[in-house]
């Protein structure tokens, strides 16, 4: 039998397709009409509970067949049955705005008054605002298969802060695991006869919520996630009445790979501690910076000359997320190793203190100059730093980014001198003026 469903790129439709796949315990291409006839009754049993109906009002508005004042289980049942009856084979083209493989639905209830609008497809137009739709048509042109998939979509959502998070990814693996978690939550509600609505991890900030969900998925499912080219987009939305709302957040592939690498090197507990320290009243500064493409290097420091993770973890972040050249990363590491060796030979934390407290680029250069002189005094065979290395790799942009280079040097020095520093306690010795 030809496949019924095809992934469309429409986040609402695709979410519903993965829910159907998980509920039927079949691959998407193997789903049959008989599966749909068996599954649609579950929607009726669930959606007419108080908590789910409340969610549906903000997902589909009060004009949806399950939420309308005249809505009854029988009315919604008829709607779902007619969508299933209207399933037609896929073609090479069609007018459906989602799949493009079938023509518009012939189901009457889907086209009442204003056609297919926000009461059936969230965040689209409604009523007689025909200028919202292509060619001033009365509502969207969408086939019955895609409309049916959207009916399962709410199960895929996470409720968060009075709105909903919809995840969409280029990775079928990510979409499948996301659906698996949500369906497991639904089955739990059914088994306990305790209906609480869409899945929630009890985090009200959307950025914090979806980062935690991604991290939990990476930890829970044993995959080589750090080798996957995963891109994730989150839609944080509400389709409620006169105040629809949507914000879009992207998790780029390098950020996902970094989160996966944290698990790969068994640094997850330290990562949780790192991010746990980054919360403030506005959210989580580490997660927010990853979303904005800003550096999180400073957050790898615990304080008291201790760091989270190790150089390999930081290197992966620098290479994957910051897109720093590996030769430069290695040059900074090697310089830090030479400085660490020098400090231990001097048996003095003076230079380390100066490096920690320097305020500007000029002061930073002076610390390096003092260190270079110290290297000569103790008889180091090679120069601490060479000219070409300094201008070509350590600070190729001059003063720009000097403070991050300083932080990277300190990270490696703390790692290399961990035991030595620990034995000296919190000793601080001030030295020459910079």
For the regions a protein language model found, what residue spans apply to each?
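Intrinsically disordered, low-complexity regulatory regions
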Residues: 196-434
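A sequence-composition feature that detects small, non-aromatic residues
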Residues: 3, 15, 51, 66, ...
């Amino acid at each position: 039998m030809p496949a019924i469903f095809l992934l469309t790129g429409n986040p609402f439709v695709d979410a519903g397709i993965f829910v159907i796949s998980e509920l039927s315990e079949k691959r998407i291409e193997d789903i049959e009409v008989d599966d749909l006839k068996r599954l649609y009754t579950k929607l009726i049993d669930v959606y007419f509970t108080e908590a789910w109906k409340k969610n549906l009002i903000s997902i589909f508005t009060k004009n949806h067949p399950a939420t309308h004042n005249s809505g009854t289980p029988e009315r919604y049942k008829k709607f779902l049955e007619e969508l299933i009856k209207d399933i037609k084979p896929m073609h090479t083209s069609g007018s459906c705005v989602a799949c493009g493989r079938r023509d518009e639905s012939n189901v009457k209830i889907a086209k009442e008054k204003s056609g297919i609008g926000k009461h059936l497809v969230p965040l689209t137009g409604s009523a007689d605002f025909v200028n919202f739709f292509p060619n001033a048509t009365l509502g969207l042109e969408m086939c019955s298969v895609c409309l049916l998939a959207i009916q399962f979509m709410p199960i895929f959502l996470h409720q968060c802060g009075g709105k909903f998070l919809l995840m969409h990814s280029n990775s079928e693996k990510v979409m499948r695991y996301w659906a698996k978690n949500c369906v497991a939550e639904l089955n739990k509600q059914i088994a306990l006869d305790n209906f609480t609505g869409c899945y929630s991890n009890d985090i009200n900030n959307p950025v914090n919520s979806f980062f935690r969900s991604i991290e939990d998925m990476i930890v829970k499912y044993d995959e080589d996630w750090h080798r996957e080219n995963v891109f994730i987009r989150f839609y944080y939305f509400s389709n409620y009445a006169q105040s629809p709302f949507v914000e879009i957040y992207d998790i780029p592939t390098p950020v996902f790979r970094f989160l996966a690498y944290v698990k790969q090197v068994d640094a997850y507990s330290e990562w949780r501690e790192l991010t746990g320290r980054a919360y403030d009243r506005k959210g989580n500064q580490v997660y927010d910076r990853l979303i904005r493409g800003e550096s999180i290097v400073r957050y790898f420091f615990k304080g008291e000359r201790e760091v989270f993770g190790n150089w390999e973890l930081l290197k992966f972040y620098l290479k994957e997320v910051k897109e720093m050249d590996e030769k430069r990363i290695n040059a900074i590491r090697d310089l830090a190793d030479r400085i660490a060796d020098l400090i231990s030979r001097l048996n003095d934390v003076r230079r380390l203190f100066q490096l920690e407290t320097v305020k500007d680029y000029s002061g930073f250069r002076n610390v390096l100059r003092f260190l270079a002189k110290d290297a000569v005094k103790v008889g180091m065979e090679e120069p601490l730093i060479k000219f070409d290395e300094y201008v070509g790799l350590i600070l190729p942009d001059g003063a720009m980014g000097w403070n991050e280079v300083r932080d990277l040097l300190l990270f490696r020095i703390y790692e290399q001198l961990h035991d030595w520093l620990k034995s000296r306690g919190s000793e601080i010795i001030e030295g020459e003026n910079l």
